[in-house]
Amino acid sequence: MNEQADMILLEIEEKMEKSLEALGREYAAVRTGRANPNILDRIMVSYYGVDTPLKQVASISVPEAQQLYIKPFDKSILKDIETAINTSSLELPPRNDGTGIRLTLPALTGERRRSLVKDVEKMAEAGKVAIRHIRRDGNEHLKKLGLTEDDEKGYLEDVQALTDAYVKKVDELTKEKSEELLDV
């Protein structure tokens, strides 16, 4: 066995794992009808003129199953947080109570659930494409090593096995998220 080729295989697996984790984080940000602070991950607040992630300027809690409460560390940015939420794609009206902001998540309609499932499927396809790109790059690196034909074939089969395994994990994650979205 070739030490360089083994290192390339490890690197490929690490990159595929990171792609899967990134997809998991994207899925966590998809609203399911239950309050989840991760849906606010993409919200950026103008804090002293700098766009800052909401999580860095406020604590986010889940007081009820359908509600999020955002309490800023600095009350002077309550209006900025409210503006950031209003301009986001969340379509959730913020309620400012003077010390924090409440977001009540309405129940998802059947049509909205199906639309979210389609979005999840698009994310899954992008995740699979990323994994296939990792496979392609890994195969190119392996071919440049000048291995014997048999060794090269064995390593390329290993890379394909990793690719198949991670694509299957993406499918499982997608099925799980889709079922969660369609569960009324």
From Swiss-Prot:
Pfam families cross-referenced by the UniProt entry: RRF
According to its record, what are the GO cellular component terms? cytoplasm
User: Per the annotation, which location comes first and is thus the protein's main one?
Assistant: cytoplasm
List, alphabetically, the InterPro entries matched: Ribosome_recyc_fac, Ribosome_recyc_fac_dom, RRF_sf
**Which key words are in the record?**
Cytoplasm, Protein biosynthesis
* Matches recorded under CDD domains: RRF
From the Swiss-Prot or TrEMBL record, state where the protein is found. Cytoplasm
Q: Does the keyword Disulfide bond apply?
A: no
Asked if the Swiss-Prot or TrEMBL record annotates the protein with the keyword Protein biosynthesis, the reply is yes
State the Gene Ontology BP annotations.
Answer: translational termination
Which GO MF term does the entry hold, naming one? ribosomal large subunit binding
**Alphabetical list of NCBIfam families matching this protein:** frr (TIGR00496)
Q: Record's family?
A: Belongs to the RRF family.
Tell me which PANTHER family the record gives: MITOCHONDRIAL RIBOSOME RECYCLING FACTOR PSEUDO 1, RIBOSOME RECYCLING FACTOR
**What does this gene product do?**
Responsible for the release of ribosomes from messenger RNA at the termination of protein biosynthesis. May increase the efficiency of translation by recycling ribosomes from one round of translation to another.
Report what the protein is called: Ribosome-recycling factor
Q: Which organism is it from?
A: Acholeplasma laidlawii (strain PG-8A)
